[in-house]
Regions:
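N-terminal capping segments
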Residues: 9-91
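...with weaker cross-activation on analogous glycine-rich loops/strands in unrelated enzymes
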Residues: 83-140
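Aromatic side chains
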Residues: 73-75, 95, 155-156
Length: 158
């Protein structure tokens, strides 16, 4: 009986900690499947100094979560999910491409074929300032061209 209770408790605990699918909606109502990982946890700040050495012109903003990425952070503001691709925000017409530079804060910068997303936080600087989640790491602010991602940068707005 005791062994059975331990097994049931283990199964209950595992079920409570399972990954789950979360649906987020674009402003036009398109549904995007995201993942909420059971193992999502606040990152240690021990690597911030090392990142700062590698990118001295970037400003550390805040601690990130391990199973959250740039797309979820930039497009939804959430740190509890992982979004594989934000392309529906554009393809359904919720956001439109902006020619040239961003025109206001809060617009979204996208690198290459949606390899990275960031929030424009100062469109008026020569190199527009963006705030973004670097992979599964922390949240940083820097000039868009200074971010550690490659590809042409496109800006999107509502």
């Amino acid at each position: 009986q005791e062994l059975l209770n331990d097994q049931q408790n283990a199964i209950t605990f595992a079920a409570a900690r399972a990954d789950e699918t979360v649906i987020v909606k674009t402003p036009k109502g398109s549904k995007i499947k995201c993942k909420r990982k059971a193992s999502n946890k606040k990152n240690s700040t021990k690597d911030v100094a090392q990142q700062k050495l590698a990118y001295p012109r970037a400003t550390y903003v805040s601690t990130g979560y391990s199973k959250n990425n740039c797309h979820a952070y930039a497009w939804t503001g959430r740190q509890d999910i992982w979004m594989q691709s934000p392309v529906l925000y554009v393809s359904d017409g919720s956001y439109k491409a902006i020619k040239g530079r961003p025109k206001s804060n809060g617009q979204i910068a996208v690198w290459g074929s949606y390899t990275h997303s960031a929030i424009v936080t100062n469109y008026g600087t020569q190199d527009p300032t963006v705030t973004s989640k670097w992979g599964g790491g922390h949240i940083w602010r820097c000039g868009a061209s200074y971010c550690p991602y490659n590809g042409p940068i496109c800006y999107y707005g509502r």
